[in-house]
Structures are given as C-alpha cells and as structure tokens.
C-alpha cells in the first residue's frame, strides 16, 4: 500500500427494498443524504447492504446508480466479494467499468479458503480490476480469518488500498 486512497467518513449503506425488489428511488435518496451529511465515501452492496441477497444485476444497477448520484462529490466503493474467485473478479471488473472508485472484497465465505488461497483470491481481483481494493476480513461471517502474515503479503499488492479489519481483535488494527 502506497498511501491512503480512502480517508474520512465512509458510510456503508443499507440496500432499501420495496417488497421483493430493490427500491432504487430510496437508494438514491439515501446516497444524496449521506453526501449532504459530508460522507467522503459510500460503500454499496457490502455486508450492511445485504450483498448475499442481491443478484449481480441488482448489484451492478446499485453501483451504476451510486456513480451517477455521486457525480464525483464522494467516492463510491462497490462490494464485489464472493465465495467464487471467478464471480468476484467478473463483478469487480464490471463495477470498475461503471466508474466506481474502489472495491470492497470480503474474504471468500463458506469454502474456508487457505491463506495462500486468500492471497490468490485478492491477487486475481486486484490484477483484474485495476482500481483500489479494500480486503474485508470478517471471520465471524465468512468462516476464515486473514492472518497477520497474510495481511502483510496483501499490502504488497499494487492495487490493495487497505484492509477492513472486523475480526474483533483491537491489537490487529496496527497491521
């Protein structure tokens, strides 16, 4: 990691629904409200945004809407992680093409990747997307923890912009 790409207030938004469908009108209002409140960046389709319940088509529309609404007034970070490296790479590339400023990629869940597997996963995403990526370590949700040693290796990746550490161990915040 060279220098911070994302600084200041970064809000992880919920994904509003109306019935069984994403409420894009309400999402636009939520984005606008966060921008007016001073958000420096907004995360769309992360854990708070119910990413596992969304289709890729819904995610891409959410990202497109986010970029359109923000109009450069704040950065848009797209949640593109998956339990499938190929799917995470594909969604990351598509999000990048839509003009998002960065990606939040949760560790692959369910499959309990090895540490070398995590490195390969993040390398595939960072190499393919070509924009800043934040690795998201949340072992309580994914079943796998990015080790301190692996964090050190990830920081050497050109496009890795940071690590969102949610393992519950405050002592790891210095990594």
Where on the chain are the PLM-derived regions?
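Catalytic beta/alpha-barrel core
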Residues: 103, 135, 158-169
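Active-site beta->alpha loop and helix N-cap motifs at the rims of alpha/beta catalytic domains
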Residues: 2-11, 15-145, 151
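Conserved small/polar residues in nucleotide/adenosyl-binding loops
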Residues: 173-175
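Acidic-histidine catalytic/liganding microenvironments
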Residues: 73, 157-158
């Amino acid at each position: 990691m060279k220098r911070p790409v994302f600084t200041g207030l970064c809000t992880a938004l919920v994904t509003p629904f109306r019935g069984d469908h994403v409420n894009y009108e309400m999402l636009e209002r939520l984005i606008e409200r966060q921008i007016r409140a001073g958000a420096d960046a907004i995360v769309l389709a992360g854990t708070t945004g119910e990413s596992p319940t969304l289709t890729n088509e819904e995610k891409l529309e959410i990202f497109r809407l986010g970029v359109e609404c923000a109009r450069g007034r704040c950065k848009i970070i797209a949640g593109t992680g998956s339990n499938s490296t190929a799917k995470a790479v594909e969604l990351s590339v598509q999000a990048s093409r839509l003009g998002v400023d960065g990606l939040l990629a949760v560790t692959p869940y369910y499959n309990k990747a090895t540490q070398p597997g995590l490195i390969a996963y993040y390398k595939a995403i960072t190499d393919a997307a070509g924009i800043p990526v934040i690795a998201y370590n949340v072992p309580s949700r994914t079943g796998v923890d990015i080790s301190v040693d692996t964090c050190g290796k990830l920081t050497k990746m050109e496009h890795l912009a940071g690590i969102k550490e949610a393992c519950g161990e405050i002592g790891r915040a210095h990594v």
